[in-house]
Amino acid sequence: MSLFDYSMEDIPPAANWNPVNLRLALWEISSQIIRDNWLAGIGISRMDETLQDYYSRNNFEFGLSNHFNPHNQFLQTFIILGIAGFALLVFIFLTSFKLALSKKDVLMTVFLSTFFLFSISESTFAVNKGVVFFSFFLSFFTFLPEKSTIYLIK
């Protein structure tokens, strides 16, 4: 059964890929990798070769020639680190949301919501810019005093 209800038999010609059907294909292949490696993952060093192998198995020539990542941070984390890494990523988001709501910090909540939603359609931590951006702003909002007027325009 397909997790994303996308059949790899329905692969369009290379000229007919769009952001939606491309991501559905990438997510379907990612779910296959997760099914085969759910406990411990495959490790960061095997990510590219494993994706290429599964693209080849599924006759996904467009993915094979373009070396796409999963375009979903949660799936990518699950592939690389297994269930423990996925659980840790979800834990980071949940505890951060809980903190933002307890502080009644609207800007932190908006930041986390935006980053969370963006992570569904992009591998945000695949490059160091995403890691630095998330780490910096999460730390900034976390350690900002609750009564801070830094957001206020006078």
Language model regions located:
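Hydrophobic transmembrane alpha-helices and their immediate junctions
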Residues: 57, 80-113
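Long extracytoplasmic/lumenal interhelical loops at the membrane interface
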Residues: 11-36, 40-81
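Short extracytoplasmic/periplasmic juxtamembrane "stem" segments immediately C-terminal to an N-terminal membrane anchor
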Residues: 1-14
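Short, flexible micro-motifs
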Residues: 44-48, 85-88, 133
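Transmembrane alpha-helices of multi-pass inner-membrane enzymes
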Residues: 108-120, 124-154
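Active-site-proximal flexible loops/turns
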Residues: 30, 48-50, 89, 126-129
